[in-house]
Amino acid sequence: GTFSYFAGVEYLGHAASFHPCGDIAQIFEEVCSGQCELGVVPLENSLQGTVGVSFDLFLKHEVFIQAELFSRISHCLLSNAPTLAAVRTVYSHPQPLAQCGGWLRAHLPGAALIPVESTAAAAQRAANQPDAAAIGHGKLADMLGLGVLARRIEDEPGNWTRFVIIGPKSA
């Protein structure tokens, strides 16, 4: 349920089989080892620049870019809490927390902001806590049975990420 997952579905369709990885390094490792035919990784974000870990991993692993895609990034606040006032904790990956910082300060000034490894992991945590929320893709709500307390909470609406599809052979 990460933004990389939704970008992959957008590009490859639902006919492709997807499975979660713990982090970007694991995607590279699984593509190199043959556990996965392809991987989807973020390369650049229009607000925060290059995704340094992805560039570093290209230097360590023999993988090739098969395709690239650009995806608009819009964040939602996902929760089982009945209202914003009931939210005490917000989980997300550090980038969405930063990209929504102004909105969070304005609407949830007392909430604890907890960085986790991915937006999907954040949503899973929020699903298990009645006073918690997660920042992530709106489609995560359907996947985990969460409500959407707010949409388009990013501070800058022109947020795009360049994703690349990587594979073990040159395209």
Question: What do these predicted ranges mean?
Answer:
Residues G1-A171:
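Domain-level signature for soluble enzymes in the chorismate/prephenate branch of the shikimate pathway
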